[in-house]
Amino acid sequence: MKAIFITLEGPDGSGKTTVGTLLNQKMTEAGIDFIKTREPGGSPISEKVRNIVLGIGNEEMDPKTEVLLIAGARRQHVVETIRPALAVGKTVLCDRFMDSSLAYQGAGRDMDMEQVLQVNLYAIEDTLPDRTYYLDVPAEVGLARIAANKGREVNRLDKEDITYHEKVQAGYEKVINMFPERFMRVDATKTPEEITETILADILRQLA
């Protein structure tokens, strides 16, 4: 069985974390040799950067600072976690990657998406996902889910208004148009179990 680099993307409240947990279980049961990781984070240094970027109280952070910090964390994640796993034949399942920067920092912060892309390509070089699952859910539904989930860890980006989250969604649509060959859109209004089964079936096809 070959190893591939898989990413989960979607707006806040799309259910990515829940689906990622279920996928972890189902992929293990299917006998897939893989690691599960996340961004921002995924390595000791990158997790420290995550705490800075998402920390409540850092609302004054400049948008370009945000882009550069996340790209730096991503670089460390790639060299310390993702590439080593792929090199020994392990599939990588990652909660968010470069596309999140294009949508959240690029579109969400009204920055030039091409510039954000170039910064990230410098950081990751040739380590691009083989398959990206976009969990598609309306912004208002996602924010309602966040509000209803009292046990969820709330970060700085969750506190942005709906206009910001609508910009993020529009940004994702642009990203999908940039890389249509690796994206699969998944209806995230369905149950986490249904979403997981849809994604797992495609993963097994990709690995065949």
UniProtKB/Swiss-Prot annotation:
EC assignment: 2.7.4.9
Binding, ATP: G10, P11, D12, G13, S14, G15, K16, T17
Pfam families per record: Thymidylate_kin
Assigned keywords, A-Z: ATP-binding, Kinase, Nucleotide biosynthesis, Nucleotide-binding, Transferase
First-level EC class: transferase
One annotated GO biological process: dTDP biosynthetic process
Reactions listed under catalytic activity: dTMP + ATP = dTDP + ADP
Cellular component annotations (GO), alphabetically ordered: cytosol
Molecular-function GO terms, alphabetical: ATP binding; dTMP kinase activity
Function of the molecule: Phosphorylation of dTMP to form dTDP in both de novo and salvage pathways of dTTP synthesis.
HAMAP family assigned: Thymidylate_kinase (MF_00165)
Family to which this protein belongs: Belongs to the thymidylate kinase family.
Protein name: Thymidylate kinase
Source organism of the structure: Listeria monocytogenes serotype 4a (strain HCC23)
